[in-house]
Structure formats: C-alpha cells, structure tokens
Swiss-Prot record:
Belongs to the YajC family. The gene is yajC. The chain crosses the membrane at residues 25-45. Pfam families: YajC. Keywords: Cell inner membrane, Cell membrane, Membrane, Protein transport, Translocation, Transmembrane, Transmembrane helix, Transport. One of its GO terms (cellular component) is plasma membrane. Signal peptide: none annotated. Part of the SecDF-YidC-YajC translocase complex. The SecDF-YidC-YajC translocase forms a supercomplex with SecYEG, called the holo-translocon (HTL). This is Sec translocon accessory complex subunit YajC. NCBIfam families: yajC. It is found in: Cell inner membrane.
Amino acid sequence: MPEIIYAAAPGASNGTTTTATGGGWGSLLFMLIFFIAIFYFMIILPQRRREKQFQQMISQMKRGDTVVTIGGIVGKVIDIKKDTVKIKTANSTELEITKRAISTVIKERSQENQEG
C-alpha cells in the first residue's frame, strides 16, 4: 500500500522523465491569425454589408415614400436635405429627423403598382 501512495505523490519518479514541450511562437501566431479571421468574418464583414444596404436604401428614398424611424414614428417624406429628412406624420405634424434615424423605407404604393 505505501508504494501506491508514493507513486501518486507529486514529484515521484519511476525512472522516466517527461518534459512539456510548448508550441512556441508558431502556434501562438497561428491562433492569433485564426481569431483575427474569425473576428473579421463574424463581426466586421456583416456590419459592412448592413451599412452598404442602409446607404442604398437612403439614397433611393424620395418624396412620398413612407419611412419608419428607429423610435417607431411612421411618416411620409416631404423634403430631403443632405443629412436630414422632413416627414409628415398621421396627425399632420412635420418632423425633421436625421437620415440615421430612419429604420425602414416603404416605397410609395402607386409606384409599386406601376412596377409590379
């Protein structure tokens, strides 16, 4: 029984030695490149796609289109400026909002009927 305890004790040697070998800088560099690639494909690339879609949506917006803001306000576009859009809500209130505050652009119905 004492042999079992001795063999299980830390630092006990049975005549063979093992050395831990590290991966060195190569494996560290590989892991770093791997995580940067994952970060790029999971975060940066989709964000660029969303930004491109948003810019396209805003550039195609015109007077008469209905927009929904990020706050949930729905209105009809009555004027478009460089950075802002003036909309008219259901109770005839005119609001000037930034283009960044627009969540969705709903095309004018008469134009959709002519196209489709």
